[in-house]
Amino acid sequence: MPVLNTDALITNRVETIRRYHSDAGIARAELDVSGGIDSAVMLMLLAQALGPDNVTAAYSSINSSTESRDRARLVAKAAGVKLLELELGDIFEAIGLEAMRAFGAAGFDTDFIVKFMEGDASVDGSLRSTLRAPVGRYLNRMSGGGIRHGTGNECEDRWLRFYQKGGDGEVDTNPLAMLSKGEVYQLAVALKVPTEIITALPTPDLWGVGEEHNDESELLKSSGVPWTYSRINPDTNEYISVGTIERMSRFLDSQADSVTTIEMLLFGAPGRDEDVAFGVSGHAKEFGLTREHLASARKWERSTRHKENPNCPSLGSRQELLDAGIITNELPAL
């Protein structure tokens, strides 16, 4: 399985976070807790690295599901961290009304805007995400100031860049950035994250409909291609399925030059079509990937390059963990 030694991985992440804070001369940290697996793992790591009393953890609901709030409470209790619970729904609604008033006053066609937003829930979803970031910063300052840690993992951040640039992407570090979603799940089991969080469907909960809006369904709707996460058995901590996003990451690692663009790795040249590319990178099918996956990956990577933030440290690299024998790039044979 990709994580060969979960205890060593926990030690590595805890010590690296602790060293980063020590070098910066900053004792405290702030984390936005969503009730999902990534923020749960980060909260457990921060509590171990810095001590529970040095972590400002915030759950900001914007007409969010009760299930996500319950899960946030569960992991805060498990980590021994006090959880700040805020309801930003009224503020969110007020901003929407004021924005519509401003469009109307400026002479825009508000009927068009209403119709457009009815067909694209991500418009309001982007405000939900970006509204939480300044609130998190404010809570951070109110509690004495600290490092604002992110929760992005490799499957979301590497080439999909499945995050909001001014929202969940507006952080100081991403200590999970080198780990796949499956590896984050394995880390969660080892950290004793509550099972309810490990088995919950990954969702950004940005549309106000709970798990009806989940990561995989949004990716499928946007691309027409089944981009999926890996799953693990919480009892054995072993993979029960390998997601196509993780497969793509390991396929990219298998290519000769991992520092060039994904387009050059997959296609050899920007103008090359999918059929030719599939021949060039023919062993993609050995990773369970299709021509459609290659075409979709190129489209996603092209359209999200503006989000990339190379200055946001991941506090280490995947290669360092590979060299230490803590993880492996070899996918489970299922």
Positions of predicted regions on the chain:
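ATP/NTP-dependent adenylation/nucleotidyl-transfer catalytic domains that generate, transfer
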Residues: 1-31, 45, 53-56, 63-64, ...
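Conserved G/P- and acidic residue-centered "switch" motifs that form tight phosphate/ATP-binding loops
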Residues: 36
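Short, surface-exposed alpha-helical segments at coil->helix boundaries
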Residues: 39-43, 66-73
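Primarily recognizes the serine-hydrolase "nucleophile elbow" in alpha/beta-hydrolase
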Residues: 48
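Acceptor/aglycone-binding surface of glycosyltransferases and processive sugar-polymer synthases
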Residues: 100
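Internal glycine-rich, Lys/Arg-flanked active-site/core loops of soluble domains
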Residues: 133
